[in-house]
Amino acid sequence: LMEGAIQPRISDVDLSQVLTQQLFQYYDSLSEAGIALEVELEEHLHYATDPELWERLLQNMLSNVLKHGKEQARLTLMSDADTIRVELRNIVQQPIQHLDQLASRFYSENLSDTEESSGLGLYIIQNFVEILGGDLQLATEADWFVLTITLKK
């Protein structure tokens, strides 16, 4: 993801619909992994963005839950007067040691019991969020990892 290499193609996107499609694609994998996903979704939430990047962003987020999550995850898509917020929280397999480095390129804490990680997942997510003009926040709350994307309307 070289600087300026991806130029977004902006159009009117139903964020809720694209998110729902991605959830259907990941449903079986999440179920097989024993991860119960709770979803809170504002319907017909439209936003001027790149539909392909939005889709790839969601795929990376859900893939991250599959690799590093366990038992429970919650996905929220909501808006207020000024912003649209996507929040994905999941219980982690291993405690997170260096939250501030998680989105660094090639950094991995090997938080997964089963899989080697390239350390690119959150780095890619951060880059997509920046390309789309949004803000990415990462946090931990007890056993939970919380990823929040804020897009300005």
Label every model-predicted segment.
Residues 3-8, 46-49:
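Conserved micro-motifs of the catalytic ATP-binding
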